């Protein structure tokens, strides 16, 4: 099934974030590819992925790819795509993980045509589950695990900059080499530690601990559980059972958003949180406190 250089030879395929979420285009892609690489390390809780792809494509052409295969041995994948149709399949959407952007750039530089086949993104589904306005989400951040050896000061600053623009923040939780996701409590604890350090350097109070937060768990069947916390400080000490989570840190909520978020999280009464924290953040925004990196 070799193809000329003018044909699409590298397919970046999104498989959706749960079984049964595959598009017809994704199914067709793995069935016609000469070789199919399946990677699940960029999305925790996707152990189902390999079996699902094998059921669609047949086991003979499917290769389970490691982080090293895609990041350190990507040249081998690109070389193979010079004269064969190669599919790289990931849970969710392939362009959410920066690894796949790098792979696409390397392939294009080598003269390999690239085709992007979108999938249902777990990140976007988590945002949707909160029922907050799509247009009010700002830059996404990742809370790094302690194994990175970094203090996420830049993450704290990005959240403040989103708040200054009236935008909600989606915070992803880091994944280690074993595919285990950082726990929400530990991730938030490290963030609040970074916020205190950032506040000292910026000459402003640390405020993130007072912000409300939403924990969204992606269910294996595509459903979601939305858990509301009145403050990040409370979430940092919470004993949350194992699962695959994203965190949403809301900006100042509109009346409609507050009502919808309460409904999404099963709250039977108005949301409780420290509304005055937004006034303090907005005052600091006007003073330009968060504009200069530290």
UniProtKB/Swiss-Prot annotation:
Its EC number is 2.1.1.98. The keyword S-adenosyl-L-methionine applies. GO terms for biological process: methylation; protein histidyl modification to diphthamide. Pfam families: TP_methylase (PF00590). The keyword Transferase applies. Keywords: Methyltransferase, S-adenosyl-L-methionine, Transferase. It comes from the Archaea. Pathway: Protein modification; peptidyl-diphthamide biosynthesis. It catalyses: 2-[(3S)-amino-3-carboxypropyl]-L-histidyl-[translation elongation factor 2] + 3 S-adenosyl-L-methionine = diphthine-[translation elongation factor 2] + 3 S-adenosyl-L-homocysteine + 3 H(+). Homodimer. This is Diphthine synthase. It comes from Aeropyrum pernix (strain ATCC 700893 / DSM 11879 / JCM 9820 / NBRC 100138 / K1). The gene is dphB.
């Amino acid at each position: 099934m070799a193809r000329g250089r003018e044909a699409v030879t590298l397919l970046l395929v999104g498989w959706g974030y749960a079984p049964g979420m595959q598009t017809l285009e994704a199914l067709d892609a793995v069935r016609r590819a000469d070789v199919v690489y399946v990677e699940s390390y960029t999305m925790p809780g996707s152990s189902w992925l390999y079996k699902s792809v094998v059921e669609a494509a047949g086991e003979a052409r499917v290769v389970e790819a490691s982080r090293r295969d895609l990041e350190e041995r990507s040249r081998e994948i690109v070389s193979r795509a010079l004269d064969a149709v190669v599919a790289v399949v990931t849970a969710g959407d392939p362009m959410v993980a920066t690894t796949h952007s790098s792979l696409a750039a390397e392939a294009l530089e080598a003269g390999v045509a690239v085709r992007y086949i979108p999938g249902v993104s777990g990140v976007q589904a988590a945002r949707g589950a909160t029922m907050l306005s799509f247009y009010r989400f700002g830059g996404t951040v990742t809370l790094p695990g302690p194994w990175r050896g970094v203090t996420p000061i830049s993450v704290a600053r990005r959240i403040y900059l989103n708040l200054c623009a009236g935008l909600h923040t989606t915070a992803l939780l880091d994944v280690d080499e074993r595919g285990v996701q950082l726990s929400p409590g530990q991730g938030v604890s490290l963030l609040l530690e970074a916020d205190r350090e950032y506040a000292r350097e910026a000459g402003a109070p640390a405020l993130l601990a007072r912000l409300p937060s939403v924990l969204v768990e992606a269910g294996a069947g595509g459903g979601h559980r939305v858990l509301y916390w009145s403050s990040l400080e409370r979430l940092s000490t919470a004993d949350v059972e194992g699962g695959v989570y994203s965190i949403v840190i809301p900006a100042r909520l509109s009346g409609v958003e507050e009502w919808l978020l309460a409904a999404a999280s099963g709250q039977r009464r108005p949301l409780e949180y420290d509304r005055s924290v937004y006034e303090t953040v907005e005052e600091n925004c006007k003073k330009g406190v968060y504009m200069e990196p530290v």
